Regions:
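Short glycine/serine/threonine-rich phosphate/pyrophosphate-binding segments
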Residues: 83-94, 115-117
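Active-site nucleophile and cofactor-binding loops and adjacent substrate-binding regions
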Residues: 14, 57, 80-86, 109
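Active-site/ligand-binding loops adjacent to catalytic centers
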Residues: 19-54, 74, 99-102, 107-175
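Phosphate/pyrophosphate-binding loops at sites that engage ATP/ADP/AMP, CoA/4′-phosphopantetheine
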Residues: 66-75
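A glycine-rich helix N-cap at a beta->alpha junction
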Residues: 1-21
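Alpha-helix C-terminal capping segments
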Residues: 2-3, 94-101
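Helix-loop module immediately N-terminal to the HCX5R catalytic loop
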Residues: 51-67
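Buried hydrophobic positions in well-ordered alpha/beta secondary-structure cores of metabolic enzymes
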Residues: 1, 64, 80-82, 87, ...
Length: 175
């Protein structure tokens, strides 16, 4: 990024997770709108960012279609499975198959030390409807609506929310 002229500001607040980096990026964007552009690589945050990321990541499902046609003679799998934290990998994997009922979609989330342990990032299983980073989605939160810190050994799966696309698919029992 630096080679392309970007100024990189490491996040030193909180636990230095995706949530903390997103907090700082949005804060800087709001405080310096004249020279700051907000771009994120995960399907979280306010519209249109989750949709933009999903569309850009859709090259994954395009490649799946192409390779399946090449090797199997059909362009759809029986199942698609992808991990979800913020959800960019999953969004790209399922993008061109969301409306194809022949394809079963499985979203895997970080269970941590077990969903009943209090040390988990299983937002689909444990989250409640809430707002995080300008997006209405499933969020790990307490009874007062305060966001809880998720637990995962994976840096990409420790987000306390989930992309709204994935929350909707879970709500509709599509994933």
């Amino acid at each position: 990024m630096k080679m392309l002229g970007a100024t990189v500001h490491p996040v030193t607040s909180g636990n230095m997770t995706l949530k903390d980096a997103t907090n700082e990026a949005i804060r800087d964007w709001c405080c310096h709108p004249e020279d700051t552009y907000y771009v994120i690589g995960s399907t979280v945050g306010p519209h249109p960012y989750p949709d933009m990321v999903a569309r850009l990541q859709s090259v994954i499902s395009e490649e799946i279609k192409k390779q399946l046609m090449e090797h199997e003679g059909r362009d759809y799998p029986d199942y698609l499975m992808a991990c979800v934290g913020g959800g960019s990998n999953a969004a790209g994997t399922i993008y061109h198959y969301i409306d194809d009922e022949r394809v079963k979609i499985v979203l895997a989330e970080a269970g941590g030390k077990g969903i009943d342990s209090g040390l988990s990032a299983a937002t689909i299983q444990l989250g409640k409807l809430g707002i995080i980073h300008g997006s209405k989605t499933l969020v790990m939160q307490d009874e007062d609506g305060q966001i809880l810190e998720p637990y995962s050994i994976s840096a990409g799966l420790d987000y306390p929310g989930i992309g709204p696309m994935h929350a909707n698919l879970a709500h509709e029992h599509r994933a």
